[in-house]
Amino acid sequence: MNTVRVTFLLVFVLAVSLGQADKDENRMEMQEKTEQGKSYLDFAENLLLQKLEELEAKLLEEDSEESRNSRQKRCIGEGVPCDENDPRCCSGLVCLKPTLHGIWYKSYYCYRK
């Protein structure tokens, strides 16, 4: 019975002493991994930031193209039917209801101001 106790005590002492050494090693390993993890996070953050900047540049480029193409390309000349809600009469013309001619075709025409 004494040999069992001595053996158990010896195994217990070895486990405690080796466990503490492992604890210190584990602490150092965890610290190294944490530092590596921070560098990985910084790398991933920079990569994500670059992708977002590229997307933003593309979106701004598309907006500038739209603004260049957004001007009115064609306009309606004098005496041509127009839409009251969306008048596309040329500059110097106004979309008005006709007085005599054309009252039976459409309700609005482009006239000089």
UniProtKB/Swiss-Prot annotation:
Subcellular location: Secreted
Superkingdom field: Eukaryota
Region ranges (Disordered): 61-83
Maturation propeptide residues: 22-74
Tissue-specificity statement: Expressed by the venom gland.
Disulfide bond among keywords: yes
Record key words, sorted: Disulfide bond, Ion channel impairing toxin, Knottin, Secreted, Signal, Toxin
Family named by the database record: Belongs to the neurotoxin 14 (magi-1) family. 01 (HNTX-16) subfamily.
Function: Probable ion channel inhibitor.
Protein name, as recorded: U11-theraphotoxin-Hhn1f
Native species: Cyriopagopus hainanus (Chinese bird spider)
